Amino acid sequence: MSHSSTQVRRVYDPLLRALHWVIALSVVLLIASSQLAEAFEHGPYETAIWNLHILAGYGLTAALMARLLWGLVGPASARWQDLWHPAVWKDSLKRLRLPNAHRVGHDPIASLAYLFAYGVMTLMVVSGLGLAASEFQAGPLAAWLGNAGWLEDVLEDPHEAGFVLMLGFVGLHMAALVFHQLRGERVAQSMVTGKQYLDAERGVQHD
């Protein structure tokens, strides 16, 4: 992308960017702590690591709830409509081609991955709160589910499946960022500065 053909737009608001990074940090902590807890199973640090895991889960829960709300009342680029592009998805599937034009706001194809990730994170939050209550007698559901030992067997498999799916999303997300960066497309910077860098030569789509 040549600098002469680049349009710079301020698109992503500060709260959206802050929530993005809180969610990202929470997910990294959750992944790391779950693996460390397995590595130190039955060791002196296992309980402390699981407590960190639960705290990171609270952080993800709060940030995800705020993001869901901000998607309803926030500015245009933060709203759920900005992630919902069924016509573009149908056209891309029909032609087996990605859209050529850059779009102001979230990329329509990447939006599918984001919606998938939000769905997986919701599953992780619900199952995680249930597991924290039934296994560790911790969290807001402990008063109701603290003695429901049977719930561990019900929630453990969905929680672990969500972990695998989330790990796949993180890997795909990082690979896509590297790919765009190698092509000279400054996608990663958008969630730092709030600015979107659009290639005018490819066309800029407005909704």
Q: Over which residues does each language-model region extend?
A:
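Membrane-embedded alpha-helical bundles that constitute the cytochrome b-like, heme-associated redox core
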Residues: 1-207
